Every structure is written in structure tokens, then in C-alpha cells.
């Protein structure tokens, strides 16, 4: 039995590794742990893990799902899941506060609903969910969000998500240039402020409280 006490790069480039169980270890942080493990299909993580660090699963093209909902993860680091071309679903924990730049870059099969509404996410980094193939179905953001990086939700195709739910107050938020690069419908959630975007995804002001209370759907154009 292999005893693992440190999650830094321990299985990097093990291209024949298909399954890994770290659930009984005391590891709380991972970094580069499974980078380049192209055959990896199943991973069990310890519930007390707090950080999925830089490049942890980069290039794990056979990984189809990741369930972090029962963990204590607060941060998903830069490029943590980049180039996971087979990744279809991700469940996020309530403890999550940050998704760093390029975290899910080029996850072309991550096309279902991206639901962050039950998390405590404050920041989403540059190109965090940038896609070069396929588009997200729906994006739900939490009311805790304070910053969305440039091209965080951009994609190469002209088709956008079905809807984007923005639950936030613009006066407290920072939305960087081209955060939502393509034109998308934005759903105004009842009794909450929301954000309108111009054709390049830049912030364009906020809806009135009256309009938000009624609930509206804004189709944005260039």
C-alpha cells in the first residue's frame, strides 16, 4: 500500500492511473497532484480537504465528474481542472469562496448547468470557465460574488447560455472587461439587483428595484 501524506505532484504524469482513493488520508491541500494523468476516471478525496491547488487535475481528460459538495474546499486554484476535456459535471461545496484564473479552462464538455448559487464564492478569476468548444447551459451565481475576471465566462462559439442568473448588487461588485464576452440573456431575479451587459460583456448599470421586483429578462445586443 502506498502511503500518501503530501498532495503535491505525487501522481503527476502517471498516464496509466485510472483510479485514486485519498479519502482516508489526512491531506488538506492538493497541488499538481494528478497533472497529466490522462487515464484517470475516478477520484475520492478526503472530506477535510480545503484547497484544490494549482494544476491539480490539469490534463485529466478521462475525468467525467467531480463531486466536492461534501468537502471543506474554500479555493479552486489556477488551472486546477484546465484541459479536462471529458469533464461533464462539477458539484461545488458551500464553503467555496474563490475560483482562480483558468481553473476550468478548455473543459469543452462542461455544458450543463453551472450552479454556484449555494456557494460563498466571492471571486472568479480570469478565463476561469473559458471554453473553446461547447457552451454552458445555465450559470447561477451567488449573492456573495464581488469580482468576475476578464473573459471568465467567454467562449469561442456564437451561441451563449440559455440564461444567466445574476444574484448580486452592482454597487459592490467589480465586473471586468469581457467577463461575459458573447451576448446572452440575463434573468433579473425578483427583489434583487442585477447587472446589464453591453455587447462586449462590460457592466452597463443596474436595474431599478421596481424592475427587479417584477422580474425581467433582458436580451442584450451589440
Annotated model-derived regions:
Residues 1-5, 14-29, 38-51, 61-75, ...:
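Structural signature of tandem-repeat unit edges
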Residues 8-12, 31-35, 53-58, 77-80, ...:
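Consensus positions within tandem repeat domains that build extended binding/scaffold surfaces
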Residues 11-12, 34-35, 70, 118-119, ...:
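A structural signal for leucine-rich repeat
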Residues 125, 194-196, 221:
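Beta-strand secondary-structure signal
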Residues 173-178, 218:
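Generic alpha-helical secondary structure signal
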Residues 191-202, 216:
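Solvent-exposed beta-strand/loop surfaces, strongest in extracytoplasmic domains of secreted
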Residues 215-222:
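A short beta-strand segment in extracellular, disulfide-stabilized domains
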Amino acid at each position: 500500500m502506498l502511503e500518501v501524506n503530501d498532495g503535491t505532484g505525487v501522481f503527476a504524469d502517471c498516464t496509466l492511473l485510472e483510479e485514486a482513493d485519498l479519502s482516508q488520508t489526512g491531506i488538506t491541500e492538493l497541488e499538481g497532484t494528478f497533472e497529466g494523468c490522462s487515464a484517470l476516471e475516478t477520484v475520492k478525496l478526503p472530506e477535510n480537504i480545503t484547497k484544490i491547488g494549482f494544476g491539480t487535475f490539469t490534463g485529466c481528460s478521462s475525468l467525467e465528474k467531480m463531486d466536492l459538495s461534501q468537502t471543506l474546499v474554500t479555493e479552486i486554484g489556477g488551472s486546477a481542472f484546465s484541459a479536462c476535456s471529458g469533464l461533464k459535471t462539477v458539484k461545488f461545496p458551500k464553503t467555496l469562496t474563490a475560483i482562480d484564473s483558468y481553473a476550468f479552462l478548455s473543459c469543452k464538455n462542461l455544458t450543463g448547468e453551472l450552479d454556484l448559487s449555494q456557494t460563498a464564492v466571492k471571486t472568479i478569476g480570469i478565463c476561469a470557465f473559458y471554453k473553446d468548444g461547447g457552451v454552458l447551459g445555465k450559470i447561477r451565481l451567488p449573492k456573495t460574488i464581488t469580482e468576475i475576471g476578464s473573459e471568465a465566462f467567454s467562449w469561442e462559439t456564437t451561441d451563449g447560455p440559455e440564461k444567466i442568473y445574476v444574484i448580486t448588487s452592482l454597487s459592490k461588485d467589480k465586473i471586468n472587461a469581457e467577463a461575459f464576452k458573447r451576448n446572452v440573456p440575463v434573468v433579473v431575479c425578483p427583489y434583487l439587483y442585477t447587472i446589464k451587459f453591453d455587447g462586449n460583456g462590460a457592466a452597463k448599470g443596474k436595474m431599478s428595484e421596481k424592475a427587479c421586483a417584477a422580474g425581467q429578462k433582458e436580451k442584450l445586443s451589440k
